[in-house]
Amino acid sequence: MSQSQMMLQQKDLYTVQAKPQVPFGHLRALWFQITGTLCNLTCVHCFISCSPTNHSLEFLAPETVYRYLDEAVQLGVREIYFTGGEPFMHKDLLAILERSLQVAPTSVLTNGTLITPRVAEALGRLQASSPYSLEIRVSLDDVDEAQNDAVRGKGALRKALQAMQRLQAQGIPPIVAVTEYLYANASRDAASDHGEEQSQGEGSGFYRKFRDFLLSNGIDKPRLKMIPVFAMGQLEGAVPLAQYVTTSMLEGFDSDTLQCTSSRIVADGGVYACPLLVGEPQARLSTDSLADALQPCTLYHTACHTCYVTGMTCSNY
C-alpha cells in the first residue's frame, strides 16, 4: 500500500470516529492574518500556500483590526501577533502597529525582505515611543544561501540578513524562525543511508549552525524559534504518515499546552481557532465577534496532531 493510500485510509477511519474537542481557557494571544494568503515570496513549504497571486484570503482593513483590538482589550488579551502572507506588504502596517503597541506586546512574523532602512527606522521609533515591546520574527531555512534560496527564492537570505542587521541597529534584536524542512529531509536521507542512529543528535547541530551564523553577522543575542514541518499547504501529502488526534490521546493530557486553548486568529472571513488553520471552514468559530469565538474547538486536522506531539505553538516561545 502506498503512503498516499495509507493516509486516505486513515482519514476515512477518522471521519467515522468522534473528533475530540478542547475547551477554551483565557485569551492570551490574538493573531491577525493581516495580508491573508498574499506574500511576495512563494516558499516551497508554506503551510497555507501563500504567494503573490493567492487571493484565497485577502488583506484585513485597518478598521477591522482596530475593532478586534478594542474587543480583545475587554477580554484581557496579553499578546498581539501579525502574520500573513507577508505583513509588510500592508500599506497601513506601521499605523496598525502603533495602535497595537498601545494595547499589548506585539510581534510581526515576516520573511524580512521588505524591511528597508526606512521601514527599520520607523520600527525603531515605534519601539522607543510605545508602552509595550515590539518583536520582529524573521523566517529562514538555512544559513547557506543556495539552500535557503532554493526554498524561499533568489536573494531571500541576503535580504533577510540585511533586515535583521537593520533591526539590530534600531534596538530590536530579531527572533529567527527556522522551519525544520531542510533538516527533516536531511535526517531522513541520513537515516536511510546509515541507519536510524546516524541522525540522532543532529538537531542540536542544526540549532548551533544558525546561532553561530547570527553571531558572526552582528546579531549578538540570537534567539531561535524552531518550527516542525506540517503536512499541509505546499507539503500536503508529502510528510510521511500524517496522523490525527483521537479522544483517547487526550486522556490525562494537559490540553492547556495546545495554543488553541488560549489564542485565536482574525482573518478574512472571521475568527479561526488556530493560525495554522485560517481559511478552513471547520476551524472558523465566528464571523464577526471575538467573544463568540472563545469556545471549545475541534482537533480535526493533521496539524493538530503535530502540535500535540511536538508541543509546537506559533508564539515566540
At which residue positions do the language-model features occur?
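Accessory C-terminal segments flanking Radical SAM cores
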Residues: K225-Y317
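Short, well-ordered amphipathic alpha-helices
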Residues: L30, V119-R125, R208-R211
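Eukaryotic acidic, serine/proline-rich intrinsically disordered low-complexity regions
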Residues: M1-Q5, M232-L235
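Canonical radical SAM enzyme core domain
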Residues: T53-R67, P87-A128, I136, L140-K159, ...
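Residue-level preference for long, well-ordered alpha-helices that form the structural scaffold
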Residues: K19, A61, G153-A156, S199-G203
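Short hydrophobic segments within beta-strands
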Residues: Q33, T83, L109, A177-T179, ...
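Conserved alpha-helical substructure of the radical SAM core
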Residues: M6-G84, F88-R99, V103, R118
